[in-house]
């Protein structure tokens, strides 16, 4: 899934999401049953090098993309979770990240297990793609878990505040959860990214109608 794109893909929208949403490189074929070809992190031990963990995470993410294209959404969700599991613990908390950005020596050598700047960016990009893709998969369910969609989208926005798809889907999730003020906020933020997107415009109109009705009921109750 590209991190910029149309709002198509939310439940009930006029048009479905683009296949393979959330992935950059052409993915390999999905292996049914969750095997994936890459060993689970625990199978090789905690001493695996960051580069190997990142490689495996990217492989699982790519397999998830293929599963999404094949409309195997449950399998895709499993692949994206496996990708995130590979990356778990690689990035330090935000406070420590600033300290880690300083060179470990005058030569700028990295301590064992510490990520390079390029690796850190790669890890964050994979995490963003996986969370966006998980939200896209959940929105294909017959009964959508909008609370979980919201959770994944907010994780993306914490890392990349102007991510269009996460902004739009956050708005959709808040709309269906009945929090129309927050829905309108995120939808308007999405509109600043793509002012002509028809799905964003439609959900803004729906949200404003809900807010208007709520306001009218409050006046009648006074």
UniProtKB/Swiss-Prot annotation:
It holds the Pfam family TPR_2. Residues 1-49, 88-116 are annotated as: Disordered. One of its GO terms (biological process) is bone development. Keywords: Phosphoprotein, Repeat, TPR repeat. The modification Phosphoserine is found at residue 105. TPR repeats lie at residues 56-89, 125-160, 161-194. Belongs to the TTC9 family. PANTHER family: PEPTIDYLPROLYL ISOMERASE, TETRATRICOPEPTIDE REPEAT DOMAIN 9. This is Tetratricopeptide repeat protein 9A.
């Amino acid at each position: 899934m590209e991190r910029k794109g149309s709002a198509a893909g939310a439940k009930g929208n006029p048009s479905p999401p683009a296949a393979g949403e959330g992935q950059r490189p052409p993915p390999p074929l999905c292996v049914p049953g969750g095997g994936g070809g890459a060993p689970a992190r625990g199978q090789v031990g905690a001493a695996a090098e960051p580069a190997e963990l990142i490689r495996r995470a990217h492989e699982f993410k790519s397999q998830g993309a293929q599963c999404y294209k094949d409309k195997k959404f449950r399998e895709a969700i499993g692949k994206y979770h496996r990708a995130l599991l590979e990356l778990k613990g690689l990035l330090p908390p935000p406070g420590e990240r600033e300290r880690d950005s300083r060179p470990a020596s005058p030569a700028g050598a990295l301590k064992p297990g510490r990520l390079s700047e390029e690796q850190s960016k790669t890890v964050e990009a994979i995490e963003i793609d996986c969370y966006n893709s998980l939200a896209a998969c959940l929105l294909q369910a017959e009964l959508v878990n909008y609370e979980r969609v919201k959770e994944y989208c907010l994780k993306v926005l914490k890392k990349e505040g102007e991510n269009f798809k996460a902004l739009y889907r956050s708005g959709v999730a808040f709309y269906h959860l009945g929090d129309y003020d927050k829905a309108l906020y995120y939808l308007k933020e999405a509109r600043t990214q793509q002012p002509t997107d028809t799905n964003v415009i439609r959900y803004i109109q729906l949200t404003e109608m809900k807010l208007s009705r709520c306001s009218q009921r409050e006046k009648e109750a006074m």
